[in-house]
Amino acid sequence: MNRKGNLSMTTQLQHLTLPEDIQQKLLSYKEQPISPEFQSLIGTSGYEAEDEAILFDAIIALAMGKNVLLKGPTGSGKTKLAETLSSYFHKPMHSVNCSVDLDAEALVGYKTIENQSGQATIEFVSGPVTKAMKEGHFLYIDEINMAKPETLPILNGVLDYRKMMTNPFTGEVIRAKSGFGVIAAINEGYVGTVPLNEALKNRFVIIDVPYIKGELLKQVLMSQSALKDEKLIDRFITLSSDLIVQANNGQVSEEAASIRALIDTCDLAAYIPPRRAIERGIVEKLDDDREKAAVRNIAETLFE
């Protein structure tokens, strides 16, 4: 790593005023060489929160070898936080997107037939869990509570003090390389989710990730969206605030209040009328006609 990168990293860490030993641990990760094939898996920073403790505590937990579970509503920035952590630790992050169809092969890997010099051989292709463990990288499990409960026990040994797993397809015992860490995310109350069983939940340090609001949201929209009209952005911030209230009251689903959807909408509003942008970026993502009407009503009061 060059001197400029080292100075940049040091500045980031001083901004958070992390304990000296934690800073040194992060700087040591920064010095470790990363194989070119994994360089693109290192996340980019950019997560913002009103409460600095969210990022601070996540860094401390990961640096101490803890597994971190990010809990929060849809679009509150959990994935962006995970990418920011990957950036701070300068670690590639292998991702698993959970669904009811998730199986052991999607986690661990699968066998395939390869043709070498005219001979058919069976090879094992590593999955994200296997790669992250062997390389000492981060593993990100998104929407972990979307997976079927019977799929997840394969991770129990990976997530406890042993940090090991027996590959069910090859019999290989895999012990995680130093530096391996797990970040998972859940959307509570989301359709299709199931409660995490206590044995799995107890393997994590849990960090709540709420929606961002007000001036901080304005900074995010100004920096991360194509829209630069401050007056228009202020109206979108009011829209977001109203939608968060309605989502908390159960009048609209969390998708309507998603910060990710709001950024998409602001991007569109840089080129098309705001209400049409809201239709494309927020309203049409909703399934319930009453929710669509509620969002449209708010939009009509804020935008001509």
From Swiss-Prot:
Molecular-function GO terms, alphabetical: ATP binding; ATP hydrolysis activity
Gene3D superfamilies to which the protein is assigned, alphabetical: P-loop containing nucleotide triphosphate hydrolases
A Pfam family recorded for this sequence: AAA_5
CDD domains on file: AAA (cd00009)
Recorded superkingdom: Bacteria
Residues bound to ATP: G72, P73, T74, G75, S76, G77, K78, T79
PANTHER family xrefs: MAGNESIUM-CHELATASE SUBUNIT CHLD, MOXR FAMILY PROTEIN
Family of this protein: Belongs to the CbbQ/NirQ/NorQ/GpvN family.
Name the UniProt record assigns to this protein: Uncharacterized protein YojN
Lineage, uppermost ranks: Bacteria, Bacillati, Bacillota, Bacilli, Bacillales
